[in-house]
Amino acid sequence: VFRFTSPRVLAALVAAGLVATGLAAVADGSAQAVTTGATATTALSSNWYAAAPYLMPLQNDPPDPTAVMAATGIKAFQLAFILAPNSGGCTPTWDGTNPVSSDTTVGPMISAIRAAGGDVSVSIGGYNGTKLGQVCGTPAATAAAYQQVITTYGLHAIDFDLEEPEYENATAVANEIGAAQILQQEDPGLYVSVTTPGTTSGTGWFGEQMLDQAKTDGFTPNNFSIMPFDGGFNGAASQISALEAFNTILMNTFGWTSAQAYAHEGVSMMNGRSDSGEYFYQSDFQTVLNFAESVGLARYTNWSVNRDLPCTPVDNNDQTSGSCSSVAQQPWDFTKYSVLFAGATPPVSPPTSTPTSTPTPTPTGSPTSSPTSSPTSGPTSTPTGGSCTAAAWSSATAYTGGAVVSYGGDRWTAKWWTQNDTPGGPAGVWTNDGPC
């Protein structure tokens, strides 16, 4: 059942002229939801909204989300983006061109996701287009526009993606943060994330101003997330350094301990080649995931499911694409890390003695060969039980559940999908079958 709109937000809806498009006011000041093409459902546990990767439902060759769910085990997607109309006005649209009030495409997609056992969060803002916070005159009017989206789709989660040029406009930021606070108050249980650009020092001056606005308003979302890409980053180590710096910024802004700050901090990465030519591989996602789990990070997501496919050619001629990653991968490799963050196990493929396919070698910068020496904990000599016949483990190869490799003189079997997780390592994804 849809959330009912409170009198406070209803008044703003009336003022904004939104009632006729999705709500029918009743005499006592409440509102009734009308049929919209997206069936409401019970909320998922918050870990799925925290792990939901971004997906553009109308652009960049959107994949079938239910097929991605079946292949990976992912249960939630972050649908992007809600913007102001390109023609002007304070009403919500998809990508500035498709009014939410007359949507016939995204609603059925959401219903299909829910029918498959999943759900969505909707992201507002992004890098391109005019944001509602820029054109709606007040936080209440901005909230009213977003409330239409929440009511139309029966949402349990929403993301505020505050980027350039909007977050350079103090009034627009005040409208967005104020709107987020209103929605949080008027829609009990609504999961709210705030996402902003990351820098090698955490976030920039405008990001810190946004945090100051939230502190002034007394607003605390489920998390503040940074995007550590397109800013001179070089792999996972630089991203982790940025997250540690952002943790310090959150501590200093809100007076939190480091643990409290991490519990309100998130990361939104970009898989493959970024807009500025940085490269992020599966091994980088695994390393950041390990860090996120070790410190209790509140959110782990990425841009985007549309891009979680191999290009042809694999490197896409050193170009960034909205519909493939420009690095060697199998379909949905990066989405599976979100599944792991949510605490689930990706689906296991039928057992096989060797990987079902050998990915094309990754571009320079990603591990491409097995270690040159065995771990110190492994045997120092070849066991007498015979020579290993299974293929040697390689950090560059993606293995499915049941795959068998040799490493350190032992035979190992993968428990589930894995890449760059050393047999016997802390990830625990390999079963030691003994000497080979």
State where each predicted segment sits:
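Acidic glycine-/aspartate-rich tracts in secreted/extracellular proteins
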Residues: 58-59, 82-85, 127, 272, ...
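Conserved active-site loop/cleft motifs that coordinate metal ions or position small ligands
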Residues: 266-269, 299-304
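A recurrent domain-boundary module in secreted/ectodomain proteins
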Residues: 308, 313-365, 428-436
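Tryptophan-rich substrate-binding surfaces of secreted polymer-degrading and adhesive proteins
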Residues: 360-436
